[in-house]
Structures are given as C-alpha cells and as structure tokens.
A protein has these predicted regions:
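Active-site loop/turn elements of alpha/beta-hydrolase fold enzymes
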Residues: 1, 162, 305
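Short glycine/serine-rich loop/turn segments
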Residues: 1-90, 127-129, 256-278
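C-terminal core of ALDH-fold dehydrogenases
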Residues: 13, 289-290
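Short, basic, helix/turn surface patches
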Residues: 18-32, 73-80, 182-196, 283-287, ...
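A generic structural signal for residues located within well-ordered alpha-helices
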Residues: 33, 95-98, 288
Length: 343
C-alpha cells in the first residue's frame, strides 16, 4: 500500500511499488493498492482496505474490481491506525458486488438480504458539472456507454448537478485529514511506542511525498480554527447538499466515473502524470471524483465498467444517501448484471 495510506499510486519507497494486477507495468492505485492487486491476481478471493478519500474505490477501479466504501461509522475501526477519525473507514475490495455485500454483512452485522432491483423506472442522478469534467477520452466514452445501457434498461437518468460541490470539497477535505493526522499519530505513538517521538517517525518515512505531507501536518499546517470550521460548518453544509439532492431530484443514487483517467505507467517519480497531453498533479487528478462522497460520509461503490483501448480497467461509481448501504449494494448488483449481459 502507499506509505501511511497517504497517496494513490502505492509507490512505496520503503517496500517498493505495487504493480497493477491487470497491467503490471502500470500503477496499482492506492492507497490500498496491494489489496487490489492481490485480488486481481487471484492471490486472494477478496480483501479489506482503508478508505479516506478513495483508497478502496480507486485501486478497485484501476484493477477491474469492485470497491465499496460504506457510510462512515458503519464498520468498527478497531485494528486500524487512523489518519482521520472523521473520514476513515474500512472497505471491501472484491470481484463481484455479491462478494462485497457478503463482506459488508460480516463487517457491519447487517444481515438484511439485498432487494432485487428492477432498473425499469429507477431514478439515477447524473451530475455532469464537476464529476464529468475533463475526462480521459476512454473514460468518457466508456461511461457514456454505461449510461446508454442503463437508459435502454429503463433507468431514468436525471441530469442534475450538486451545488458548489467542488468548492465545499476543498474546504472540507485536507483541513480535516491533515489536522486529525497531527493529533492521531502522536496519540498512537504515545500508546503503542512511547520511546519513538513524532519527529523520529517523520524522519523514518521513506516516501518523499508522504514525508512532506506528514511533516507539514505535524508542523501545524492547519490551524485549529480552520479545522473546526471544516468539520463543524463546511462538512454539514456538504452533507446537506447531498441530502437535498437525493430528496429533491428523487434519485436513489448518483453515477459518475470513479476516476477521470486510467492507470498510468509506473515510474520512480509519480508526482505528475500525463492527462490529455498535459502533465498534471497525480493525487488531486485521481481523487477528484471519489473525495466528495468520502468527505460527506456517504456510501459509494465502484464497479467495473469496461476497459480502455490499451486494456486498462475503467470503473464507474455509485454514491447513495447516508445509511442506504444495503440498498446501494442492491442497485450496484443490478447495474453490474446489466453491464455484463451480452447484447
């Protein structure tokens, strides 16, 4: 995985880069890239990763798998070393939605059976602004094909946008995770390894990108008042935007590309990647679509949607209202079936 779960390539300077399970010369995604690759290469039937801003769904998408992030708080966090108690959750990475639903049942204790969903008349939101902007050409064509198939099955695609979602996401995401990391890592050391100081921990981080982020967090990059505004004001506003959207548009889920671009070739320095002919920052480019739902704490699931012209997996994500986990899994299962049916 990416060191300390702080990245999306799984290029780990301490243990080496994780290879993509479908195209080994390409990045696995992250931060739970090792889990995804193990499942993709049949080393495991399923796995459990951690998801702060996309770390389960993103590597699942890039490896042709299913990745499920539950409503925050649905699963116990015992055994996890948290970097954000507000945002972190465990999540299954599997080959099928049914397997993800089984692990959800085990992890949550919710053994309610999945409803049989008829796509005919099912209302699904399509938020074009933000989520569909600036896509890799293969991703764009694949997702449009998915929407066409769903429409042909009778699903009602509601073209409506989430108000100010990008702006709210910026105000919530990094302020919360960086501040909480600055509190949680020292507390972890004090409890489990009191002989190691925070400064010593930071000095031992092998990955330069992670060391820079964690060092900034520990140095107080996020003032407490900014954190409290993000957690207590901006995040509730963001949650209200989602709740209002689901209610006012009468949709049970929203659908969008899990990532705006496919996996890129592995290289030593992955601070930037090629995206539509330009070098762009890797981290924000990949988490753009997975991050908002994470910050709002709502459930999201990435399922395989197809492959690029190079054979690289492409995922499509479904997000649902807070607490609708089993319903969202049932909807995902119905869409998975529709996408795998031969014409």
């Amino acid at each position: 995985m990416h060191e300390l779960a702080y990245g999306i390539t799984s290029n780990n300077a301490a243990f080496g880069a994780v290879h993509n399970g479908v195209k080994p010369a390409y990045m696995a995604g992250g931060s739970s890239g090792g889990t995804a690759t193990a499942v993709a290469m049949n080393m495991a039937s399923a796995g459990i990763g951690s998801d702060t801003g996309g770390s389960v769904r993103l590597p699942a998408a890039l490896n042709g798998l299913v990745g499920f992030r539950p409503t925050t708080g649905r699963y116990p966090n015992s055994g996890m070393t948290m970097i954000s108690n507000t945002r972190d959750t465990a999540g299954p990475i599997t080959r099928t939605v049914a397997e993800a639903a089984l692990l959800d049942e085990v992890l949550s204790g919710d053994n309610s059976s999945l409803a049989a969903i008829d796509l005919e008349g099912l209302r699904i939101g399509v938020p074009r602004a933000y989520f569909y902007e600036t896509l890799d050409v293969n991703v764009a064509s694949t997702v449009e094909s998915v929407l066409k198939k769903l429409s042909a099955k009778g699903a009602i695609l509601v073209e409506a946008d989430l108000d100010d979602i990008g702006e709210l996401n910026e105000k919530v995401g990094f302020p919360i995770v960086l501040y909480e990391t600055s509190q949680l890592l020292p507390a972890y050391l004090a409890k489990y390894q009191p002989e190691t100081s925070t400064e010593e921990l930071v000095a031992q981080i092998a990955s330069p990108d992670v060391k820079g982020i964690v060092a900034d967090a520990m140095a107080g990059a996020i003032p407490e008042e900014v954190y409290r505004d993000a957690r207590d004001v901006q995040r509730p506003l963001m949650q209200a935007v989602y709740a209002d959207y689901f209610r006012d548009e009468g949709v049970e889920a929203i659908i969008f590309p899990t990532t705006a671009l496919t996996a890129r070739p592995r290289k030593d320095d992955m601070a930037t990647v090629d995206f539509n002919g330009e070098q762009v920052p890797t981290f924000p480019s990949y988490i753009r679509n997975t991050d908002p739902g994470s910050n709002a704490g709502i459930p999201g699931i990435s399922i395989p949607a197809g492959v690029s012209s190079e054979g690289l997996p492409i995922g499509v994500e479904l997000d649902g209202p807070a607490g609708s986990d089993r319903r969202l899994l049932a909807i995902a299962a119905a869409i998975e079936k529709a996408l795998t049916e031969t014409d």
